[in-house]
Amino acid sequence: NEDGYNNVIGTDGLFTFSKYWKFEYELFLNYSKEVIADWIDSDERFSDFTVALDGESFNGSALYSTLRRDTENWSTRIRYFDISPEFRSDLGFIVENNLKRISFFQGYTNYLNKELIKRLSLSSRYELEYDYSNNYTDSKIEGYFTSASVLDSTFLYNYEYNFLNSYL
């Protein structure tokens, strides 16, 4: 039985360009070598590698980035995720790989600060997800309505329409 390893290094940052515009990112790289063991009995493959624990070495990456604009009432986000098929983080925080996802978010919040209703928000989001073979895996649009009232109670209504998948 040969020892394996999984080393992950990363960096993150938040850049403020003006009162309203910000860019943030997280970037991780991993360097992995599998143990040699018969724990997994599978012929499946990812990229050029087997799922079996046969001592292969591979490197992967993960990127999260957001360009955002926030004013008193408006919030805009453009987000991009990119997790390579070879990325591994054995801590369990990242539970999927082989994906690229871009999303667009726009929201409006009215701070009424009345006795019963403190805040009303209306927002929408579009998300497109695909894998490293450029197969679309998810495409959806969502709408949100949120009302915040006394004693920090919140009502949230969410509607999602998925263009590729149906869960009925």
Predicted feature locations:
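A conserved hydrophobic secondary-structure block that centers on an alpha-helix together
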Residues: 1-7
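Exposed, low-structure sequence patches enriched in small/polar residues
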Residues: 14-17, 23-168
